[in-house]
Amino acid sequence: MTEAGKLPLPLPPRLDWFVHTQMGQLAQDGVPEWFHGAISREDAENLLESQPLGSFLIRVSHSHVGYTLSYKAQSSCCHFMVKLLDDGTFMIPGEKVAHTSLDALVTFHQQKPIEPRRELLTQPCRQKDPANVDYEDLFLYSNAVAEEAACPVSAPEEASPKPVLCHQSKERKPSAEMNRITTKEATSSCPPKSPLGETRQKLWRSLKMLPERGQRVRQQLKSHLATVNLSSLLDVRRSTVISGPGTGKGSQDHSGDPTSGDRGYTDPCVATSLKSPSQPQAPKDRKVPTRKAERSVSCIEVTPGDRSWHQMVVRALSSQESKPEHQGLAEPENDQLPEEYQQPPPFAPGYC
């Protein structure tokens, strides 16, 4: 008898029909004595050789869907096909009677002879070794197929020993714990992400504030540059007035004039009049001169170098006074000075 834990070799595909359709029906009331599994024709003849006449056995056929009835005749062993019909009945080809089971077929031919030899079935041929039956492989294979159909996933796992599975599970635990620790550390180190809608709102607000911030920065830069330019230009002009050649000339030409000191210090007055050219203002402590006197003073004291300096001051002041709300208006030409600050023609009165 084969070992209980060892599976038999797989049956040929032509025997699958027996395992799936006939095994339960055949073993319902116990396996009959005349059934010998899927033995070959030669093995069947060897078993019947020592048996009396009329001894028979039934085996699973290897050539068709059905069985083979083998019995011992007077001269030799005879073999008849037993076909399994579509409705589940059994019939020997050439006969007209179909039987519901193999037991019914055996009982029928124990009473009526098999054509054409007209011989009856007398007694079944039993197993040669009852401890090692020849149909055991079929039943083992049928049980294995039934278990695999019931639980196809757990069948391979049961074949491996349990200690190995326990050892593998113990080895896998540290790696799983390490993975959990690393995932926790990664989640703790990463800052919480803000929702997408909140991020969009922040971005939109910053984009809205860009033009206003740019305008404020531009105004601050303009005011800073204007103050720096004015302060530097005023310092340069004061140094040139104190130590320049224009001062000596004015003092020599007007040394006898009591107002020569005032005229030598008329540049700050001119600078203040540039801030509001339309309304020139004179110092309070001196008399207001006539138009001709102003022209003569401007002609005497204003030189080409002074004119360029005045132009730079006017440009700086105009850029400082320009504001965003006046951007649409046309700017006045910075190069055009009032008539009082321009050089008079060569033959104008008061020209010297």
UniProtKB/Swiss-Prot annotation:
CDD domains: SH2_HSH2_like. Changing R59K: Loss of the ability to inhibit RE/AP up-regulation in response to TCR/CD28 stimulation. Residues 34-125 form the SH2 domain. Residues 283-295 have a biased composition (Basic and acidic residues). It comes from the Eukaryota. It holds the Pfam family SH2. GO terms for cellular component: cytoplasm; cytosol; mitochondrion; nucleus. GO terms for biological process: negative regulation of B cell apoptotic process; negative regulation of mitochondrial depolarization; signal transduction; T cell activation. InterPro entries: HSH2D_SH2, SH2, SH2_dom_sf. May be phosphorylated by FES and ACK1. PANTHER family: HEMATOPOIETIC SH2 DOMAIN-CONTAINING PROTEIN, T CELL-SPECIFIC ADAPTER PROTEIN TSAD. This is Hematopoietic SH2 domain-containing protein. The gene is HSH2D.
